[in-house]
Amino acid sequence: MSKIFVNPSAIRAGLADLEMAEETVDLINRNIEDNQAHLQGEPIEVDDLPEDMKRLHLDDEKSSNLGEMVRVGEGKYREDFQMDEGEDPNLLFQSYLDNVGVQIVRQMRSGERFLKIWSQTVEEIVSYVTVNFPNPPRRSSENKSTQTTGRELKKETTSAFSQRESQPSKARMVAQVAPGPPALEWSATNEEDDLSVEAEIAHQIAESFSKKYKFPSRSSGIFLYNFEQLKMNLDDIVKEAKNVPGVTRLAHDGSKIPLRCVLGYVALANSKKFQLLVEADKLSKIMQDDLNRYTSC
């Protein structure tokens, strides 16, 4: 008959587990007793209550106090919606606008139309500004205000004009540096630069993000390429696409933009693989034809 030997350490471990289990049970029982301590006292009979308790009622002052408490609570809710005094409103507003932009892109990717999204977004932004940015006090001198406004408008006009001139020059610079189509003759210029235009361009690109377009190959054939192969963020693609002449105007009018031309331009400036595969002269002609066809409609 075989003998079974038990390791003493296993016995000690089992005893320790039993002790811990007993302590756990005791702790649970104590917690239950503490939680039910209010039930262990003697019950209060209704007949033992003072006679004055039967005549208790709420008067008008109490009800008015309740109304004041409700109004205070509502005021506290409005204060919670507003910003703290120690926080910079400009930074918070910038963060809010960034979140709004991300939300717009997500809604457009889900299939919602831009005009509906934009109308709702404008209402939200107006509400935010109304709550957090009250009207500043008027200046006593109208001449100072007029002079300041004139200087600001002049600065904004100068900066906007310099930005518009820098966009075509940037496009020409990219076309010259990159080993792509050097002979593109683009006469149109981008003049609109607002969020609605960027959103429309992003919407059209996002809808065709995986669609493959035909491009001329160096091997006298064709190859397929799409926006997804760029490995770029949608925002960066939109910024590059705005440098293509005529794209901003088409997006502002709600027309279709030449996506193959845009893809060729962005890929030529950012993808070395695309530069090695594509035939530069043929690509130049294709991009020019696409641009002329879309802008002439």
UniProtKB/Swiss-Prot annotation:
Post-translational modification: Phosphorylated by host PKC and by an unknown kinase.
MF terms in GO: RNA-directed RNA polymerase activity
Secretion signal span: none
Region (Disordered): 134-176
Motif (Nuclear localization signal): 211-214
Gene Ontology terms describing biological process: microtubule-dependent intracellular transport of viral material towards nucleus; symbiont entry into host cell; symbiont-mediated suppression of host cytoplasmic pattern recognition receptor signaling pathway via inhibition of TBK1 activity; symbiont-mediated suppression of host JAK-STAT cascade via inhibition of STAT1 activity; symbiont-mediated suppression of host JAK-STAT cascade via inhibition of STAT2 activity; symbiont-mediated suppression of host toll-like receptor signaling pathway; symbiont-mediated suppression of host type I interferon-mediated signaling pathway; viral transcription
Keywords (A to Z) from UniProt: Chaperone, Cytoplasmic inwards viral transport, Host cytoplasm, Host nucleus, Host-virus interaction, Inhibition of host innate immune response by virus, Inhibition of host interferon signaling pathway by virus, Inhibition of host STAT1 by virus, Inhibition of host STAT2 by virus, Inhibition of host TBK1 by virus, Inhibition of host TLR pathway by virus, Interferon antiviral system evasion, Microtubular inwards viral transport, Phosphoprotein, Viral immunoevasion, Viral RNA replication, Virion, Virus entry into host cell
Sequence segments annotated as region (DYNLL1 and DYNLL2 binding): 138-172
Record motif Nuclear export signal, residues: 49-58
One Gene Ontology cellular component annotation held by this UniProt entry: virion component
Ranges of compositional bias, category Polar residues: 158-169
Annotated CDD domains: RABV_P-protein-C_like
Residue positions where Phosphoserine is found in the record: 63-64, 162, 210, 271
Family, similarity comment: Belongs to the lyssavirus protein P family.
Record's function text: Non catalytic polymerase cofactor and regulatory protein that plays a role in viral transcription and replication. Stabilizes the RNA polymerase L to the N-RNA template and binds the soluble protein N, preventing it from encapsidating non-genomic RNA. Also inhibits host IFN-alpha and IFN-beta signaling by binding and retaining phosphorylated STAT1 in the cytoplasm or by inhibiting the DNA binding of STAT1 in the nucleus. Might be involved, through interaction with host dynein, in intracellular microtubule-dependent virus transport of incoming virus from the synapse toward the cell body.
Name listed for the protein in its UniProt record: Phosphoprotein
Organism expressing this protein natively: Rabies virus (strain China/MRV)
